[in-house]
Amino acid sequence: MAPGQAPHQATPWRDAHPFFLLSPVMGLLSRAWSRLRGLGPLEPWLVEAVKGAALVEAGLEGEARTPLAIPHTPWGRRPEEEAEDSGGPGEDRETLGLKTSSSLPEAWGLLDDDDGMYGEREATSVPRGQGSQFADGQRAPLSPSLLIRTLQGSDKNPGEEKAEEEGVAEEEGVNKFSYPPSHRECCPAVEEEDDEEAVKKEAHRTSTSALSPGSKPSTWVSCPGEEENQATEDKRTERSKGARKTSVSPRSSGSDPRSWEYRSGEASEEKEEKAHKETGKGEAAPGPQSSAPAQRPQLKSWWCQPSDEEEGEVKALGAAEKDGEAECPPCIPPPSAFLKAWVYWPGEDTEEEEDEEEDEDSDSGSDEEEGEAEASSSTPATGVFLKSWVYQPGEDTEEEEDEDSDTGSAEDEREAETSASTPPASAFLKAWVYRPGEDTEEEEDEDVDSEDKEDDSEAALGEAESDPHPSHPDQRAHFRGWGYRPGKETEEEEAAEDWGEAEPCPFRVAIYVPGEKPPPPWAPPRLPLRLQRRLKRPETPTHDPDPETPLKARKVRFSEKVTVHFLAVWAGPAQAARQGPWEQLARDRSRFARRITQAQEELSPCLTPAARARAWARLRNPPLAPIPALTQTLPSSSVPSSPVQTTPLSQAVATPSRSSAAAAAALDLSGRRG
């Protein structure tokens, strides 16, 4: 490699495309790819994707899809039997990050029960003798599910396997997703001293056992349930061992620490545990919650909180349960503000109703205000938009009780306090959002006030509704034009009733029959009320007319006072306006007029009747003397002699008259321009 050349390291596909964790389509594609590849080890980026998907999908998929938080275990396997090969708690905690699902869709929860059965058949179809396969001359590890099957099957005798197959047939009809009791309640035997010694011995024995290199331990959340015909001592040891495993596995994997699998053999045990649960509810309930680490906040927000459901029974439970509930909230991380605003918490309605009843009985308004202030300070402040739109249970009932019980002054004070405590919303939201009780308040104000004060009260209401902040006059004017004024429609309806017809008249056609009396003329169409108001305003005169002159005698009269306004004109633009093509036309016009006058002066004596008579007399009596100049100019060499050429021209043609010569001189036909 050249010294200046750096090794080319391509960005991992998972880092370049972070949406991989949020796309179910990629899960389906990876499932198809795993089917094409066959059995083989998981790629590192796929394992990391499974880890990241556990954090992302936990709160989004809900309780109905929890195969991500609850790892996949083959059907018919007992958790106690699998725990024998899984190692100690330390190793279990380190290796629980690697899921045993053979493809990504199992971690995403995209595979249903049929797909799970198909995967098990595919895994069990491989003979157990094939502990490993050789690919390209090297030893390649098997898939995790197959390795777990081989590891668990190696320590069993054929009798146990046969019993397992029968257990599979029994458990196929079992409800897989019944809501679980806590693991403390499922395994009450952990509290006994004999079981603690058995747990210590079993943990020491399992921690020393080593795992095979390619194996990946499977985790479970189901609580162990044994048959009633087994020995009591074996049942206790195995139950304590299973409880130990379940207490370790959910904490390390970050899943729900409650079982999701209900077994048919536990029906009798649960009946016995209910009595123990009722007696020790105050002590046992906060135990698993306080000991378990903090779960994901999105899952917590969607789970049913047992402490919230039990708050309705606070008086019956006593002080011990209150102490237990006080210890629970610090371990629960607060969810986001958006989830708190939208997620329904069981017990909210009952709590608010109880608070309202206690407040009505005791009439302690100050205590209620202090409680509201504490609640508002404890809960994180949500967005203004969410607070204005999200419905909070108890709003309508509280406002109705306040209106019925308190006086008007108390209402004003309480509204001022609530407006001071709550963050001010935008003017747009306050103008458009409906606040319960507005209509009733406005109707009462209109009934109480007199008719002469209606306009003032409506204007005040319009300002209060449209302008929460008095520092914005532009917004006030804008919202006053668009806001709803409760008295406007009633005024227009009354005026329309007085007018005669509230609705526009239909289109009418008149047919005139000759010889009959024509129908009476229709009433002229009347404009709507708003247009009539608009026309009334400009009709009002702006100034009073002169009282001396009557309206009918008005004529156009000029004022005696004349005002002269001087127009300032610059010399440059005025001179430029004179220039143009019309200047040359004006010069030509003047020259032509001058020449016409000159020709008229010369030709006027020739056009008199006396001059014309003389000219005709000359033409009738031509002179007999020949004109030598004209005969010399005629050509004689080229053309033979003819009688026409020898004949002398007449005097009129040969000798021009004086008048024609004078006219030619006067016209100046030489071609020169004047």
Curated annotation (Swiss-Prot):
One of its GO terms (biological process) is intrinsic apoptotic signaling pathway in response to endoplasmic reticulum stress. The keyword Endoplasmic reticulum applies. Induction: Specifically produced in response to stress: in absence of stress, some upstream open reading frame (uORF) of this transcript is translated, thereby preventing its translation. By methyl methanesulfonate and ionizing irradiation. By IL24/interleukin-24 in melanoma cells; which induces apoptosis. By viral infection including enterovirus 71/EV71 or HIV-1. Residues 162-172, 348-373, 395-415, 439-458, 490-501 have a biased composition (Acidic residues). Residues 337-510 are annotated as: Interaction with SMAD7. The lineage of its organism: Eukaryota, Metazoa, Chordata, Craniata, Vertebrata. Phosphorylated at multiple Ser/Thr residues. Phosphorylated on tyrosine by LYN; which impairs its antiproliferative activity. Phosphorylation at Tyr-262 enhances proteasomal degradation, this position is dephosphorylated by PTPN2. Residues 22-39 dip into the membrane without crossing it. It is found in: Endoplasmic reticulum membrane; Mitochondrion outer membrane. The phosphatase activity of the PPP1R15A-PP1 complex toward EIF2S1 is specifically inhibited by Salubrinal, a drug that protects cells from endoplasmic reticulum stress. It holds the Pfam family PP1c_bdg. Residues 337-510 are annotated as: 4 X 34 AA approximate repeats. Residues 206-221, 246-256 have a biased composition (Polar residues). Keywords: Apoptosis, Endoplasmic reticulum, Membrane, Mitochondrion, Mitochondrion outer membrane, Phosphoprotein, Repeat, Stress response, Translation regulation, Ubl conjugation. Residues 65-504, 534-554, 625-674 are annotated as: Disordered. The keyword Ubl conjugation applies. This is Protein phosphatase 1 regulatory subunit 15A. It is a peripheral membrane protein. Its main location: endoplasmic reticulum. Changing R614K: Reduces PP1-binding. The modification Phosphoserine is found at S143. The modification Phosphotyrosine is found at Y262, Y391, Y434, Y512. Residues 282-298, 418-427, 630-666 have a biased composition (Low complexity).
